[in-house]
Every structure is written in structure tokens, then in C-alpha cells.
Amino acid sequence: MPLLKSLKAKLLRAFAKRMKGKFVYDAAQYPLRAVTEEFIPSAWGPARALFYWPNTESAQPLPVYLNLHGGGFVAGVPEHDDSYCRRLAHNLGCLVVNVDYVLAPEHPFPAGLRQSFAVLEWLAEQAATLGIDPQRIAVGGHSAGGNLATGVANLARGHQRLRVVHQLIDYAVLDLAQDPALKLSSLDKPLLGAGLVRFFNSCYLSDPAQARDPLASPLLATVDELRGMPPATLITAEYDILRAEGEAYAEKLRRAGVTVTERMFAGCDHMFTHLGPDDSAEQAWQLMEDGLRGAFQLEAVASGAEALA
């Protein structure tokens, strides 16, 4: 591994860790039964994951949301999504599993993807012990995490022991084969620039030819390869250089017969759900929450409870 690449990756990770406190909610805002740290076995070593347990009296197995953080496959930590995970666990009564997957360049494609899928399979295997429903699992992520999430959903198609019922794809990188210089924004200096994307891609792909693999570049999957994918909530931002590939992926999913709820947020750039504007971020979080609520069929359960009250 080139020394300069390794050093730059470590600097980005150090910055990401310093930033994690910015995204952690006061626990009192969304009270939960517990947040626990688990280590899940995988071929790449134990995968650290934060489990957000809802404070629910339901005797029914819990639905599960598997969250994959962003960071260009190179940096980022699950704590960046802490506020989001607390909100979903509290508001939906689901178990949220926030995964600290292995990072490039030490662990290039497909390690992070395959480890995330291994976590999903472990959850299904441990469903009875954990008290979860392996037939009501959703996956999602932001930026690079959105890429991994839709890849995990693809790998899970037709699985015998689990079912992914929804995918959240939030301003995701979906085409690693396209020259980053061709990914344009109307801003002179968008938050995510071509140079940084090029660096992330060089770390994640040990061979540039891997960029053509649909599991690395979901947009390059054929329509037939996307048939049977779960419904999606897909979010893009007006000024984000990844906007066009997100919109193209939404259209390709629709051509494959997949139900897609899509929204482009005007006046926003990459990572706006975490950095603001706050009004747009709140609308995006609510859109994602609503997508999961419908997928988990919580509205029907709530309606039934009200009818019996």
C-alpha cells in the first residue's frame, strides 16, 4: 500500500473521529431501553456494531434497521449517525444496528460490503435470541454507506433465512466507473469535490476494473440484475456532484419494477442530512422514517391497537 495513500486515509479518519461528537444527540431526546456495543464474527475480524434497543412493551419480534455510515469507504464512524439511529429506534420501535465496517485501503472492495452482509446474516441466525424478525429487515446508509446498503440489499435477494423489505439510499455514490471530473455541481466549490472522490475510489478499488462490478457501482447493474430488489427511499441534493447518478439509479430501479420514493432537496449539498440546512435535514429524516414505517407495517399495527383501545 503506498505510504502517502495510507497517511492521507489516517488523517481523514482522525478528522472523522474528532467530528463524531457533533452528531451525537442528548440521549434524553430519544430515550431508549439501551445502547449496547456488540462484536459480530466475520471473515474480516469481529465487526463492531452499536445496537439501539427501543423501549417497547411489545411481545412481538422487533423489526431491524441496519445502518451503514458514510465516509468514502475510507473514513467515517458509526457515531456520525448516532442521532439518526436513536430517532429511528425510538420512533419506530425497531432495533437499529449501526455497523462499524472495515475500511479501505487496508480492506478494499468487496470487504466492507461482504462484512456488512455477514452482519445481516448473523442477525438472522440469532433472531430468536435477539427477539427480532428476520423477515422485516431494512438496510440504509449515507454517501458510501448508501452504496453499501443497496449492495447488501442486492446480495440478500432470495435469501432463505431473511428478507430485506426496504432500502434507504441517501446521496449515495453509485457509479465508481465515471471520471469524477465529469460529476458536476452548479457550485464552484461543492462539499464533495472530484479530487476527494478520486482518492476514495483509488483506496476502495484494488483494481480499476472493479469499478464495472455492479456491487461496486450499482448504477451499472442491468435492469434484470435489479429485479426483485426491495422498495427504496432515495434522496439526492441539488448541489451534490453525486446527484445525477442517484437520479439515474432511481430510474433504473423503476425500470426493474422496484417501487422508489425519490426526492431531490433544493438548495442542499452533500451530507446535508448531517450538516444542514436544518429544515431540509428534518424533512429528509422524516421521509426516511416514513419509508421504514411503511415497510415494517407499523401503521397497521398501530391502527389495530387503537381500534382495540
Where are the predicted features?
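Disordered regulatory segments flanking catalytic cores
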Residues: R18-M19
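Alpha/beta-hydrolase superfamily serine-hydrolase fold, recognizing
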Residues: K5-L7, L11, F23-A309
